[in-house]
Structure formats: C-alpha cells, structure tokens
Amino acid sequence: AGDKPGDALLDEWLG
C-alpha cells in the first residue's frame, strides 16, 4: 500500500 508498514497490513485486511 503506502510507505508505512501499518498501511501494508491495512491493505491485507481490506483484501
């Protein structure tokens, strides 16, 4: 997703 690691996790959760 974005540059933040948390954003990558959110991208997985959103599918």
Curated annotation (Swiss-Prot):
It comes from Zea mays. On the 2D-gel the determined pI of this unknown protein is: 6.2, its MW is: 45.0 kDa. It comes from the Eukaryota. This is Unknown protein from spot 502 of 2D-PAGE of etiolated coleoptile.
